[in-house]
Amino acid sequence: MTGLMQGKRGLIMGLANDKSLAWGIAKQLSDAGAELAFSYQGAAMEKRVRPLAEQLGVARLFDCDVSDMDALDATFDALKAEWPTIDFVVHAIGFSDKSQLRGRYYDTTLDNFLMTMNISAYSLVAVAKRAREMMPNGGSILTLTYYGAEKVIPHYNVMGVAKAALETSVKYLAVDLGRENIRVNAISAGPIQTLAARGIGDFNYILKWNELNAPMRRTVTIEDVGGAGLYMLSDLSSGVTGEIHHVDAGYNVIGMKAEDAPDIALA
């Protein structure tokens, strides 16, 4: 796919480390010729992101707290000073108090509910509003979601609710921005051992269950997600918007445990 993204520029938000879904997408975009900028939050995250940026020759890094609208404005102003226009944005952002990603959903506190919804769902709306101003010739906005938005996944709790809001936001934004030739889509990735996933209770059990019951009898990789991301952000998907695209080895089509799947314990 060398050259598929040649001449295109975009911002990747939420890259955490080399296990991130965003990293899988960033590598594919870079290999296809895209020019990238990264955003991160805080000095600790910068230490992780900067070496990755160097690997891909990314020179534009921005510290951005998406829950702070002034900080978000400053990030896009700084990006606009470098690039007057962009072609795509990857929104790979979500956060919740990990102590509430175990146990029962009704134990979610109001403060954590509001914070999780703000960072994990509303931030896409805020980002899209600002990205739109830098996409006079159209573009593509891509976010990341999970099957816990559609069905109950143990311990996913308030993140499932936030991802459901995120997925619905994708559809409303797709309508708002479609006339401007700006496409908005989401990738619903199967469970992968990422930094964010480590905070979910019994995650290894969820991972193994998916492996044993998905039609392809495996879990997905960041390379799988990266390939789908490249498609969604390139002109190959020029007629696609408002979609929740599953990259989960087919797990989302399964209605019950596979006949040949062994029983597994939580431990």
Kindly give the residue locations of the regions a language model identified.
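Canonical Rossmann dinucleotide-binding motif of NAD(H)/NADP(H)-dependent dehydrogenases/reductases
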Residues: 2-38
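Catalytic loop of short-chain dehydrogenase/reductase
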Residues: 14-23, 94-133, 137-179, 191-193, ...
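C-terminal helical subdomain
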Residues: 122, 186, 205-240, 245-249
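A short hydrophobic alpha-helix cap/turn motif
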Residues: 30, 84, 135-136, 175-180, ...
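A glycine/serine/threonine-rich, flexible loop-to-helix segment
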Residues: 50-51, 179, 189-214, 254-267
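Hydrophobic structural elements of the Rossmann-like NAD(P)H-binding subdomain
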Residues: 12, 90, 142, 184-187, ...
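Conserved mid-core segment of classical short-chain dehydrogenase/reductases
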Residues: 64-73, 77-84, 88-114, 133, ...
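Conserved glycine-rich Rossmann-like NAD(P)H-binding loop of the short-chain dehydrogenase/reductase
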Residues: 34-48
